[in-house]
Amino acid sequence: MWPDVEETKDLLARARQGEPAAVERLLSSHRDPLRRMIALRLDPALAARVDASDIVQDVLLEVHRRLSDFLRNPEAMSFPLWLRHIAKDHIIDAHRRHRQAQRRSLDREQPLAPAALADHSSFELAGQLLDQELTPASAAVRRELQRRLEAAIAELDEDDREVILMRYGEQLSNQDVAAALGLTEAAASMRHLRAVRRLRAALLPGEP
């Protein structure tokens, strides 16, 4: 979960006044949610070679270097959203380097394959989509549900996929999603509902 919005605003204000301790606390408080956000978006082949923590460190170094630019106009974009933009650039670069190392080019028209949702997250989402209690269940049932969900998620457009990853992968509340994406809570809720409906349609074709 991303840090409290008001706490982040307070740290940003103190950082703007030149408090080094506030900058350190600001970056430290965002490290864990940033790592989870990055790990969910690494292709499995890349995740086997690159630790998400290494990318997090690179992102935070860039954030520290560019923080003064952000602080000139902090109302233009929420801090978590700014972090996510920087992180996405680093994720794309990491995929490009990985594929170049294997002598394959990165086609930007193709979405990056997200890492798998955690098993409990996949199961929770499957239960919501299929309108049934799915626990207890065998490992085989869980694996099949996860496989179907991942295939369906990969077919979503980028906006819908982001909301699903944030709500079920990062375990963010609707308020957190809204803050991270720069949306109102009502707009974030509607986007989540749309994404869930599209996933349900993919998993249950022919259902109303």
What residue ranges belong to the model's regions?
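DNA-recognition helix of helix-turn-helix
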Residues: 149, 160, 169, 174-205
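Short, small-hydrophobic-rich alpha-helical interface motif
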Residues: 15, 34, 38, 55-64, ...
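Arg/Lys-rich amphipathic alpha helix in sigma70-family domain 2
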Residues: 69, 85-118, 142
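Structural recognition of an alpha-helix C-terminal capping motif at a helix-to-coil junction
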Residues: 54-61, 77-89
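A short, charge-rich alpha-helical start-of-domain segment used by transcription regulators
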Residues: 6, 17-42
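Sigma70-family region 2
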Residues: 16-17, 40-47, 58-77, 97-99
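Short, Lys/Arg-enriched C-terminal cap helix and immediately downstream tail that follows
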Residues: 35-38, 42, 156, 161, ...
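Amphipathic alpha-helical segment used for protein-protein interaction
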Residues: 34, 113, 119-162, 172
